[in-house]
Amino acid sequence: MKFLALVSVILIAYGSAWMKAYSLSEKYFAYAEEQYSKGNLITALKGMNKLELRIEDEYFGGYQQVLDTWRSSTLGPRPDAYYQSLEKPKQIIEQLNKQQLMEFIEIYVQLDSRYVPTAADQLRFLAKQSGDIALYEEMTEFLTEAFPRYNQREI
């Protein structure tokens, strides 16, 4: 009897945690989709800038937060929002122009470097394409020094 009670408590706790994560990621996904449709690509990817929020403001994440919520999940199903978010970072980074990529790198290299190497590699690609050899070399050096394990694409 005690065993069944313990199992019930564990299942209820897990179910409650799963529902909370599901609800939060659905909210983040809806916000990310809205920002994406408005052309606010970096906000769609990274969510709201937490440094600009006041205490009473509600935080809304982006595709990154949806992915982070479910990435290490081993039990239970992942929601559709997770699978729909998987390709968004690459799609968004490939849509950014040189100025947006540079701003992205400058802002997030210190705060949260996820996707910074990908953005720097895309900036390398655009620099090479436009003949901006100085920027190409700068981004190559940046990637080599700051992210030595990142595999730069052949350009």
Give residue ranges: language-model regions.
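Hydrophobic/aromatic side-chain positions at a characteristic register within alpha-helices
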Residues: 17, 24, 29, 36-37, ...
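Alpha-helical membrane-targeting segments
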Residues: 20-21, 26-27, 65-71
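Non-cytosolic head/periplasmic domains of membrane-anchored proteins
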Residues: 82-155
